[in-house]
Amino acid sequence: MLPDKTALPIITLSQPTAEVGAQVHRLISKCPPLDPNSMYCNLLQSSHFSETAVAAKIGDELVGFVSGYRIPQRPDTLFVWQVAVGEKARGQGLATRMLKAILARPVNQDINRIETTITPNNKASWALFEGLAKKLDTQIGSAVMFDKTRHFADQHETEMLVKVGPFKAVQA
């Protein structure tokens, strides 16, 4: 019997460690329109914020990464900093799977809201969070958070604050 060439590769999800920080940096650089951060920032995301981040791998290759943190004044809210999915893993629902994996961790069972920022033209991110809101059976709303002129001195597109929730705890 011939191997099935249409079979999708197995993608494993795990809580990241500092060892993937450099891979995260490379992955994000290949995922426009994401803003690159310093490698140091990616190391901190992978270590200090590992409970609210996830790494997706095919074998040893990092193909997806979500970074986030609990908003200090509202610890029931996960702020999603970045969602990166490499070309090899696109079209498989990996971004939603990664977000749900973070929410399903025992340490995150009290999170019942998500916030993120999205530029108006980032159709993939809008579709991701609109779809996630549907899957979580909750509402989604948005408003300007950082204005192109007022906050970014015309150096960056306006960032819309997107709010998803409230929702019930996500089970693994």
UniProtKB/Swiss-Prot annotation:
Gene3D superfamilies: 3.40.630.30. Keywords: Acyltransferase, Transferase. CDD domains: NAT_SF (cd04301). The keyword Acyltransferase applies. InterPro entries: Acyl_CoA_acyltransferase, Ectoine_EctA, GNAT_dom. GO terms for biological process: ectoine biosynthetic process. GO terms for molecular function: diaminobutyrate acetyltransferase activity. Its EC number is 2.3.1.178. The keyword Transferase applies. It catalyses: L-2,4-diaminobutanoate + acetyl-CoA = (2S)-4-acetamido-2-aminobutanoate + CoA + H(+). Optimum pH is 9.5. Optimum temperature is 20 degrees Celsius. It is an enzyme of class 2 (transferase). Coiled coil: none annotated. Pathway: Amine and polyamine biosynthesis; ectoine biosynthesis; L-ectoine from L-aspartate 4-semialdehyde: step 2/3. Residues 11-165 form the N-acetyltransferase domain. Inhibited by zinc and cadmium. Homodimer. Catalyzes the acetylation of L-2,4-diaminobutyrate (DABA) to gamma-N-acetyl-alpha,gamma-diaminobutyric acid (ADABA) with acetyl coenzyme A. Belongs to the acetyltransferase family. EctA subfamily. This is L-2,4-diaminobutyric acid acetyltransferase. The lineage of its organism: Bacteria, Pseudomonadati, Pseudomonadota, Gammaproteobacteria, Methylococcales. The gene is ectA.
